[in-house]
Curated annotation (Swiss-Prot):
InterPro entries documented for this protein: DUSP-like_sf, Papain-like_cys_pep_sf, Pept_C19_DUSP, Peptidase_C19, Peptidase_C19_UCH, Ubiquitin-like_dom, Ubiquitin-like_domsf, Ubl_USP48
Organism listed in the record: Danio rerio
Taxonomic lineage: Eukaryota, Metazoa, Chordata, Craniata, Vertebrata
GO terms (BP aspect): cranial skeletal system development; protein deubiquitination; proteolysis; regulation of protein stability
Protein name: Ubiquitin carboxyl-terminal hydrolase 48
UniProt biased composition (Basic and acidic residues): 635-647, 901-912
Domain Ubiquitin-like: 961-1012
Record domain DUSP: where: 457-551, 567-697, 717-830
Similarity comment: family membership: Belongs to the peptidase C19 family.
Disruption phenotype: At 5 dpf, knockdown results in significantly reduced auditory startle response to white noise at 600 and 800 Hz. Mutants have less developed vestibuloacoustic neurons innervating the ear bases, less organized and fewer statoacoustic neurons, show a significant delay in the development of primary motor neurons and are smaller than the wild-type counterpart.
EC number, UniProt record: 3.4.19.12
One Gene Ontology cellular component annotation held by this UniProt entry: cytosol
Polar residues bias spans: 621-631
């Protein structure tokens, strides 16, 4: 099928030769494309929107032919949630609770612990009525019920949210898994100790509790001092070790106590050098080794993960580590807990657990459980996950019977026994718990039944829809000569899209202002047979129904008229263009027309026609209940001129109107055209402003122009006179300075630097600005009339507010400008002393009270600022840490020179370099006096004024800070600006290091406009740690506020 635009042109091609009053019904059907051939199936890749008869590519492909029943299923098979035979049950990850799930699976597979928990007295569960849901309350009740579900539930995985909620854990915050294990076992032991059953009271100690002693031996007298202690796991340092044996050996090694760490011996009654070691005395049935992978890094101030490979045996002989014990003490590996990830603040926890009955190994990964092939533990896949491009370490070879891991953080060993005892025997679920499990299983089966019924309903519904589509789709095409109707294309697509609900047919969107089918909407509608329309409307309802009588003659006539007008416009445009090229005859009367209007008149005429059409559409939208979209021509927004140079015209010939509504005095913006040209243009713009050749320009504009030229001439004369009289001041040559007082005068005059800068601007551009008429020296005085600056302060920072004048210059200024207050500084020689001591006196005198207040205000602003700017300069080496850029010479304070690009430092480029404008700030003198913004300047000994405005350098960025924010907050800002982690930042200011992260910037002496040097440490080998910087910056609260701490 031809493209949409070609169909559009073909539908209206007849309008060029047919007058509006000669339109027939055949022309109307051509405009609505009734006779356009329908597309055959397979001929179109997508539906032809320009063809109302094209019914291909609207979603029918999926319904024609045979359809598999599975395609009708919009609900997952509930049996996929069912537990397979001889498999274990998983646990749902509630967000970041994978660390909880791993320990629950390990403790569930401890048969003695599970058997003991089943004996826990639970009167609420024993007396529970199965008509209502059981809700455990205590931790033991939750764990007991959870273990029963893990053992006999029909579900593939269960939800541990009851236990997690009872513990008060934050499901979105990953916590320290090792700390959770300790706290939970401690809480469980405390709860079970209150039971009457002695076996239940001591089950945690029997399973997990061992004993060792800290033995201290005095080097002088040899006295041993044992200090017994219990343990539930052995925390082993892995740094610098390769296998578990080395870690245990280091744990038990002897430690020397000397120097300040000497031991007080009760026998010697004094501090003596001594040795201390840990002596294992008894080991539990379940021996837990906590491998200390997550350690505190003193350099960064945060935790980090040690990705050290540690090998460990399947069978562990602990006899060599027990003193005075000859019986066998052999343990067999029963669980390995894994942390996937390279960071201590993120990652994923899984558990490898050995089944006590079959000795098969299983991997527990939240809801997913995978049985290992064979009888051996397989960790290879888990070790590959943590590898990164920067941290690949070759895995060491393991001997037979050993395993190696860089991610294992806990090893669980079970004591071997020679005979088969109750540990290997099945653990039966008590009757009262089994009843609760069966209640949950019934609920699960009911859910599965409901889901199956819903799946069957969706299949039945899909089959019915399939038959309906096959029946109706064949009836949709309207044959030639048959009655037909129009329905929305989008509705047909939704009818054929099984995923969306089908609404009633809505044809109101297609209505024109005459209540019929708008010809512009034909691309959004499809022509179907009357029989198909009757069936669709009877089943789905809706309206209004649009048939052959709904074709709008009025709209077609209006469009025909517009098309003919556009064609006539093109002919007139060519004629006007040719006539405008001819020169106007001397005896011929002409008309003034704007050059922009002459360039754009065709587009303006087209816009008027389109506005009429858009107005019709706008009214049509109101009838259909639609809103006109902003930015359309109906809203008065016109497009760019295709004939002009892009200028936007509101009305024709208004570009030669002045502000007063008369003929503009700008002759370059208008030209004369002949009466023939003007008459043709006036046909399209009857209301356009008309000016004949002899029409006078606006008198008010001419008077203002004369006055402006006179004022401009006066300003130029004034500027030349002032410049010649004060040439050195303008060029900043031969300027007096306070550092080296001129020898030929004892008095200098003072004016605000702001006055000098504004005066220079006028001298440079006298025609663009207003002349400076007065010298506002009162701005340098306090409310009492006293001067605000001392001689010493004007040598330093206060030089940014003043300019010094020679007496001759002051005499000129006092004549040319109005001066509100004379300010001078005198040099006074002390003749009473032989050393020629010199004093300096200002007039008016210094107001000491206001001066002290001003200094106090400055100091307070330095300490209590908000939203101030500081500059962070990233440096590469130590030389650049202390290097400061030389001040840049400024021969004048013009705006042009302020905009010049600043010179860059040579040396190594930094990718974080950016250049932005610097600026000086207004400084307040007190509550009523303020100094205007000016370029900060100092005066050198040579008399050349140099700018001290901040110059941004390579590798420097401006940050907005407040005095009360901490150094840590600043480091986070720097992290965002430079992509340098806070723990890799070394900050200094004026050679002084900034170290205390908790200190405020005000207390550290960081003031507005400070330059802070950033020296970044070498990037860490593990780039993925940057992803956890945000978590690092959050305060670590652990399990504060949870049930694990008794809250």
């Amino acid at each position: 099928m031809a493209p949409r635009l070609q169909l559009e042109k073909a539908a209206w091609r007849w309008a060029e030769a047919v007058r509006p009053e000669d339109i027939t019904h055949e022309h109307i059907e051509l405009a609505y494309r009734i006779a356009v051939s329908a597309c055959k199936r397979g001929a179109c890749r997508r539906n032809c929107k320009g063809n109302p008869n094209c019914l291909v590519g609207i979603g029918e492909q999926s319904w024609l032919g045979e359809i598999d029943e599975n395609t009708f299923h919009n609900i997952d098979d509930p049996n996929s949630e069912r537990r397979d035979k001889n498999t274990f049950v998983g646990l749902t990850n509630l967000g970041a609770t994978c660390y909880v799930n791993t320990f629950l699976q390990v403790w569930f597979h401890n048969l003695e612990l599970r058997r003991a928990l089943y004996r826990f007295q639970n009167s609420r569960a024993e007396g529970h009525n199965t008509d209502s849901d059981y809700e455990p309350r205590t931790i033991c009740e939750h764990l007991q019920y959870l273990f029963a579900l893990l053992q006999n539930s029909n579900r593939r995985y269960i939800d541990p949210s009851g236990l997690v909620k009872a513990l008060g854990l934050d499901t979105g915050q990953q916590q320290d898994a090792q700390e959770f294990s300790k706290l939970f076992l401690s809480l469980l032991e405390d709860t079970l100790s209150k039971q009457k059953d002695p076996n239940l009271q001591n089950v945690i100690q029997q399973q997990f509790c061992g004993q060792f002693s800290y033995v201290t031996v005095c080097n002088k007298c040899g006295r041993e001092s044992p200090l017994p202690s219990r343990f539930y796991e052995l925390e082993l340092n892995i740094q610098g070790h390769k296998n578990l044996t080395e870690c245990v050996t280091e744990f038990l090694k002897e430690e020397k106590l000397d120097g300040d760490n000497r031991y007080y011996c009760e026998s010697c009654q004094s501090k003596q050098n001594a040795t201390r070691r840990i002596k294992l005395q008894s080991l539990p049935r379940t021996l837990n080794f906590q491998l200390m992978r997550f350690v505190f890094d003193r350099q960064s101030g945060h935790k980090k993960k040690l990705n050290t490979f540690i090998s460990f045996p399947e069978v562990l002989d602990m006899e060599p580590f027990l003193e005075g014990r000859e019986e066998k003490c052999t343990y067999e590996l029963s669980a390995v807990l894994i942390h996937r990830g390279v960071s201590a603040y993120s990652g994923h926890y899984i558990a490898h657990v050995r089944d006590a009955h079959t000795n098969d190994w299983y991997k527990f990964n939240d809801e997913e459980i995978e049985k290992m092939e064979g009888k051996k533990l397989q960790l290879g896949i888990e070790e590959d996950i943590a590898e990164t491009a920067k941290s690949q370490t070759r895995k060491p070879k393991c001997s037979k019977g050993y395993h190696c891991s860089r991610n294992a953080y806990m090893l669980v060993y079970k004591q071997q026994t020679e005979e088969i005892n109750q540990t290997e025997s099945p653990v039966d679920v008590p009757a009262f718990l089994q009843k609760l499990v069966e209640q949950d299983n019934r609920k699960f089966e009911e859910w599965c039944s409901e889901m199956s019924d819903m799946r069957k309903q969706s299949v039945d519904k899909g089959k019915a829809k399939h038959e309906e589509v096959k029946e109706l789709y064949e009836l949709l095409p309207a044959e030639d000569g048959q009655s037909y109707e129009f329905v929305p294309l989008e509705w047909l697509k939704k009818w054929l899209d099984d995923s969306t609900a089908i609404k009633e047919i809505d044809n109101s969107q297609f209505l024109c202002t005459h209540g019929k089918l708008h010809p512009d909407k034909i691309g959004e509608a499809k022509r179907i047979s009357l029989k198909a329309a009757d069936l669709l409307f009877s089943r789905y309802g809706g309206g209004p129904r649009l048939d052959r009588s709904s074709l709008c003659r009025d709209c077609v006539t209006q469009r025909c008229r517009v098309i003919r007008l556009k064609n006539q416009l093109n002919e007139d445009y060519r004629e006007v263009t040719n006539l405008a090229k001819s020169a106007l005859k001397s005896e011929e009367s002409g008309f003034w027309i704007g050059k922009a209007s002459l360039r754009s008149w065709r587009q303006l005429a087209l816009d008027q026609l389109e506005e009429d059409e858009e107005e019709t559409k706008h009214n049509n939208s109101k009838i259909n209940g639609e809103k006109s979209s902003p930015g359309t021509k109906a809203d008065g927004v016109k497009g760019d001129s295709e004939d002009g140079d892009g200028e936007e015209m509101k009305n024709f010939n208004e570009d030669i109107l002045c502000y007063h509504g008369g003929l503009s005095i700008l002759e370059n913006d208008r030209r004369l055209v002949s009466a023939e040209v003007w008459n043709k243009l006036r046909m399209y713009f009857p209301k356009a402003p008309e000016f004949t050749q002899d029409h006078d320009p606006c008198q008010q504009c001419m008077r203002l122009e004369r006055e402006g030229k006179e004022n401009e001439a006066l300003n130029r004369m004034m500027a030349n006179e002032q410049k010649s009289s004060l040439l050195n001041l303008f060029q900043e040559k031969n300027r007096p300075t306070l550092q080296k007082w001129p020898q030929d005068t004892d008095i200098l005059y003072i004016v605000p630097l702001y006055f000098v800068e504004e005066w220079k601007k006028f001298i440079r551009r006298p025609a663009k600005g207003n002349p400076v008429s007065n010298v506002g020296n009162s701005i340098l005085l306090c409310p009492h009339g006293g001067f605000m600056f001392t001689y010493d302060s004007m040598l330093q920072g206060d030089a940014q507010h003043i300019a010094l004048l020679w007496p001759a210059e002051w005499e000129v200024i006092s004549k040319m400008f109005l001066v509100d207050q004379v300010i001078s500084i005198c040099r006074i020689h002390d003749k009473t002393q032989d050393n020629g001591n010199v004093q300096y006196q200002t007039h008016p005198d210094l107001c000491r009270e206001c001066r002290e207040g001003f200094i106090f205000q400055q100091q307070r602003d330095m300490r209590e600022y908000t939203q101030a700017t500081v500059y962070v300069r990233k440096v590469i080496d130590k030389k650049r840490m202390i290097k400061e850029s030389a001040p840049e010479f400024s021969v004048s304070g013009s705006d042009v020179e302020d905009e010049k690009e600043e010179p860059k430092l040579d040396g190594e480029k930094d990718p974080d370099f950016s250049q932005t404008e610097g600026g000086a700030k207004r400084q307040k003198l007190n509550d009523t006096v303020s100094l205007p913004t000016a370029v900060v300047t100092t005066t050198s000994k040579s008399g050349i004024r140099r700018s001290t405005r901040h110059r941004k350098l390579r590798g420097e960025k401006a940050l907005i800070v407040s005095a009360n924010q901490t150094l840590k907050d600043l480091k986070i800002q720097i992290m965002h600006a430079f992509s340098v982690a806070p723990f890799d930042q070394n900050l200094s200011i004026d050679g002084r290091c900034l170290k205390d992260d908790s200190a405020t910037l005000g207390s550290l002496g960081v003031i507005p406009e400070s330059i802070i040097c950033l020296k970044a440490d070498e990037p860490i080998a593990d780039y993925a740690a940057m992803d956890d910087v945000y978590q690092v910056c959050m305060p670590e609260e652990g399990f504060k506020g949870t049930g694990l701490l008794g809250h």
